[in-house]
Amino acid sequence: MADLDFSSEQLLEQARGNQTAFWHLGLRWARERDGSVDAWAGFVGEQFAPSWDELGEDASAHEVARLAGLNLATTADMRPVELSGDDSRAEVVIEGPDEKWLTEWDTTRDDNDRANELIFRAIAERRGMTLEARRDGAGLHLVFARR
């Protein structure tokens, strides 16, 4: 049984890789099936958004942005690098996805960004917020703002 005693670090690394592979496979499947990731990402966002209800009706934009960063930090190819703002407006900047993953799974940065935009927009709207998503040299910017 000693061979099956995995360290927390081994388990985390394996889980991050598996999660990232499933993400990229979902992107590629949607692109090949529908020509776009929009329907798939919209569905994923609708399914995940209720799990953020525990934040309450007046959720802090800063907390929503922080949790978005946490979710993306659990992947093997994206890293939150900056969090700023306050309860009414907050921004998280995400580096990635890594080119290695895009090449290996035949996905694109544009599809990845679009899917994240649609998923986090569904979450933001359910929390009474707007989401602005844009990419520049620093990475993918997700800006959450109270309405």
Task: Specify the residue positions occupied by each region the protein language model found.
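Low-complexity, intrinsically disordered Gly/Pro/Thr-rich segments
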Residues: 117-133
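N-terminal accessory segment detector
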Residues: 1-91, 98-115, 133-147
